[in-house]
Amino acid sequence: MPELPEVETTRRGIAPYLEGQRVERVIVRERRLRWPIPEDLDVRLSGQRIVSVERRAKYLLLGAEAGTLISHLGMSGSLRLVESGTPASRHEHVDIELASGMSLRYTDPRRFGAMLWSLAPLEHELLRNLGPEPLTDAFAGQRLFELSRGRSMAVKPFIMDNAVVVGVGNIYASEALFAAGIDPRKPAGSISKARYLRLAEEIKRILAIAIERGGTTLRDFVGGDGQPGYFQQELFVYGRGGEFCKVCGSTLREIRLGQRASVYCPRCQR
């Protein structure tokens, strides 16, 4: 699933080609995504100028003159630029044709993404209760410490809770906990303030590096230019269960935690 770095990589890739452009038309080949694409999306968006391309958590917000298109990439989705008129293959469900002669093409093999229209996107039910962005000053270790008090749940699902902080998915939660030396099974409420301060800094550092590398390509993800990300070459634990730890040489353990596979080092993470 594309996580925050992959979505931010997409945003940075498509924004220069979209902002200021007028939409000629919207071609929808398949409306049945996680939520159906609005039947009148072409009417609402055609003729409008795109004024901004922003991101909130894992949602892309294409701001037009009279509303905003909220897009989520789901499990396997991608947005990339193609020349208008380029034949669409299977799973290429939507084209937003621009006056420039380019089209923003949405591809989603599993159809678990979304394209929704909103006049007030930040008040939309999918966005209004989200926590702070991890790469802003609104997110810090102090927040993690305060929100974790009295919590018995494991620290990994705690930091993956979008009400606590947005965009920290399975890949980057695993890597940040390894970098901070914290066992992902440890109860969130038992972790000290000092360790949360370190964890927050590692979350910020790892997400920033992943964005610089264009995200992590494990299966389907490509950026707005159609190119894969390269952060997977720097993974220490995610997806490496049974392999040797790159730091201490111990065998990495894979467990189920919060209905997800989690890999950690029993020696480096306490």
From Swiss-Prot:
Tell me which EC number(s) this protein carries.
3.2.2.23, 4.2.99.18
Known partners and oligomeric status: Monomer.
Zinc fingers, FPG-type, are found at 236-270
Q: Which gene encodes it?
A: mutM
GO biological process assignments: base-excision repair
Write the record's keywords in alphabetical order, separated by commas: DNA damage, DNA repair, DNA-binding, Glycosidase, Hydrolase, Lyase, Metal-binding, Multifunctional enzyme, Zinc, Zinc-finger
Similarity comment text for this entry: Belongs to the FPG family.
Q: Where does DNA bind?
A: 91, 110, 151
Protein name as annotated: Formamidopyrimidine-DNA glycosylase
Protein's UniProt keywords contain DNA repair: yes
Q: What is the lineage of its organism?
A: Bacteria, Pseudomonadati, Pseudomonadota, Gammaproteobacteria, Pseudomonadales
Q: Name one GO molecular function term.
A: damaged DNA binding
